[in-house]
Amino acid sequence: MKFQENVKNAHVSGNLDAPEGGFDAIMQAVVCKDEIGWRDHARRLLVFSTDAGFHYAGDGKLGGVITPNDGICHMEANQYTHSTIQDHPSISLINLKVKEKSIIIIFAVTQSQHAVYKKLSEHVEGSSSAILSENSDNVVDL
């Protein structure tokens, strides 16, 4: 029940272009142990929900951001502080950090994005992709 309540009360963010900065969010969720509250001996499951594609390493050049993602925590007051300082993380960096931190990612995505995230899940060890209904009412079932 607590999980369902937390999902209903989750903060929803957006982006100005079609692809999202979800990789930045994933990286911070994975590496910010204390800020997120990951416990030492818990099973770590990260559900990433979206209806859009993603930005990855190299896309930051379009906005003049060329410093590679360093894969460390940059959160203050629950806000990511380096979105204009460093590029989005690469798929390989996300995979490395997910393996280091023993985190399982479920990409809960809409039908239109499922093929992309299914392919992505093949490159992020232990992750999987599932289809999220258009109104997200099946997220708890995933």
Report the location of each language-model feature.
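Divalent cation-coordinating acidic motifs and surrounding scaffolds
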Residues: 1-142
